[in-house]
A protein has these predicted regions:
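Terminal alpha-helical segments
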Residues: 1-138
Length: 138
């Protein structure tokens, strides 16, 4: 399997997961929206890295890798590197909390509609921009 094939696979999985976000949102499963959006964002960024010949690390927030190699991306993506890094950092921070919570942090009670909207917008943004430049997925 080549980097391009693996990257295409990542984007296909991201695109398929995007279809589930509205269902979770409609059911007010806002914590689930956050968690899924993070996984979509991460998978899409790792696809972006693979498309440019970079083997992505195994950790969840690859924002710093995006920053380091932004000169390898199309201008539209390079210009958005700061925004991409910020979103990646936010979603990574929410990753475990949205799934597991904590003693004083119950995910189903903490996350609100506006959090879910933001996560959906962020996931949509990254999937669209990467697919536009690198994928044969429509």
């Amino acid at each position: 399997m080549t980097n391009d094939q693996l990257a295409q696979s990542y984007l296909k999985m991201s695109n398929e997961r995007m279809k589930a976000l509205p269902l979770f949102y409609q059911n007010k499963a806002y914590a689930v929206v956050i968690r899924e959006a993070q996984e979509i964002f991460e998978l899409t960024l790792k696809g972006l890295l693979r498309f440019t010949g970079i083997d992505p690390p195994k950790w969840h927030d690859v924002g710093e890798i995006i920053k380091e190699y932004s000169n390898r991306f199309p201008d539209e993506i390079s210009k958005e590197a700061s925004r991409i890094i910020e979103i990646s950092r936010w979603l990574r921070k929410e990753r475990e909390l949205s799934f597991y919570g904590d003693i004083d942090y119950v995910p189903t009670e903490i996350y609100r509609e506006e959090d879910a909207k933001r996560a959906i917008e962020d996931a949509t943004y990254i999937v669209q921009i990467v697919i536009k430049h690198f994928s044969n997925i429509k």
